[in-house]
From Swiss-Prot:
Species the sequence originates in: Chlamydia felis (strain Fe/C-56) (Chlamydophila felis)
GO terms (BP aspect): dimethylallyl diphosphate biosynthetic process; isopentenyl diphosphate biosynthetic process, methylerythritol 4-phosphate pathway; terpenoid biosynthetic process
EC id: 1.17.7.4
One of the Pfam families matching this protein, by short name: LYTB
Binding site for isopentenyl diphosphate: 42, 75, 125, 223-225, 267
Protein name: 4-hydroxy-3-methylbut-2-enyl diphosphate reductase
Binding-site list for dimethylallyl diphosphate: 42, 75, 125, 223-225, 267
Length: 309
């Protein structure tokens, strides 16, 4: 008899819940249309649902009529976007994750103190673009270990590093180790820039990997943290697939013996996970479902002041 082990925590984090609730509350308070700068979170199911309810997702503020309402996505924005919104007389609401905002604030602070900032992350990811924009003359983005060797700073340059919140813990450990070897005096935040939810989901999955022969990560291909979960399994030689709906689960699984793990990215609704489990039960009728709880998450972020009762 085969088992599917559900890695827990999985799915929505506090920042994603807050961002979605911001859009829902804005639609309820002011009605459609409500404009959202970038996809509120990187998940097609969430975005499509909000679009049906009256949210309009845009990349350029010029697509919003003057005086309109705009919500900034959970990933954050560079300061010039806020300035443009002000110039266009837009009513803006910030749904940036609280933990991303913390990194923005740290980058501004240390840049003002004369530090060069090393930002570990993916250059094209919207979160990194937003953080970089806080101090473009002081920030250098590092994507991989090899980039550390190419940094132009002298050994005595005051250096401060932060990371994108959704990176692989494995990658961050390798890059920060290389950074500290080359620049022993580099400093960072007292706690990791990788958010609690990213850490919990990766560590929860790691804990079940010795018991399984295959992993499904339920998440969107655009989702950074979902892709990193897939990599956690693959680094440990466990076949893994990133799926965003039950339609993506094929009878390929019948070619593998042993138990299966399922986890989900931080922007994945739990109902999609349950649909994927149902699909697996169709393929493997005697499949047993087991929940594996690694940590209990009780983090809640308050809504922006514009939407508080």
């Amino acid at each position: 008899m085969r088992r599917v082990i559900l890695s827990n925590p999985r799915g929505f984090c506090a920042g994603v819940v807050r961002a979605i609730q911001v859009v829902e509350a804005a639609l309820e308070k002011w009605g459609a249309p409500i404009y959202v700068k970038h996809e509120i979170v990187h998940n097609r199911h969430v975005v499509d649902d909000l679009r049906r309810r009256g949210a309009i997702f845009i990349e350029n503020l010029s697509d919003i009529p003057c005086g309109g309402k705009v919500i900034y996505s959970a990933h954050g924005i560079p300061p010039e976007v806020r300035e443009e919104a002000k110039n266009r007389n837009l009513f803006d609401i910030d749904a940036t994750c609280v933990l991303v905002t913390k990194i923005h604030s740290a980058v501004k602070l240390y840049a003002s103190k004369g530090y060069q900032i090393i930002l570990i992350g993916k250059k094209k990811h919207v979160e990194v673009i937003g953080i970089y924009g806080e101090a473009p003359d002081s920030v250098t983005v590092v994507e991989k270990v090899e980039d550390v060797e190419n940094l132009p700073f002298g050994i005595d340059t005051p250096l401060f590093f932060v990371t994108q919140t959704t990176l692989s813990l494995d990658d961050v450990a390798e890059i920060t180790q290389a950074l500290k070897v080359r620049y022993p005096n580099v400093i960072t935040l007292p706690s990791s820039s990788v958010c609690y939810a990213t850490q919990n989901r990766q560590e929860a999955l790691r804990s079940v990997l010795p018991r399984v022969n295959f992993v499904y990560v339920v998440g969107d291909v655009q989702s950074s943290n979902s892709n990193r979960l897939r990599e956690v399994a693959e680094r440990r030689n466990i076949p893994a697939r990133l799926v965003n709906s039950p339609d993506h689960i094929s009878d390929e699984i019948l070619n593998y013996s042993g138990d299966i793990a399922i986890t989900a990215g931080a922007s994945t609704p739990e109902n999609i996970v349950q649909l994927c489990i149902s699909r697996l039960k169709e393929l493997i009728p005697d499949l047993q479902v087991e929940e594996d709880i690694f940590a209990i998450e009780d983090v809640v972020f308050q809504p922006p002041k514009e939407l508080r009762n």
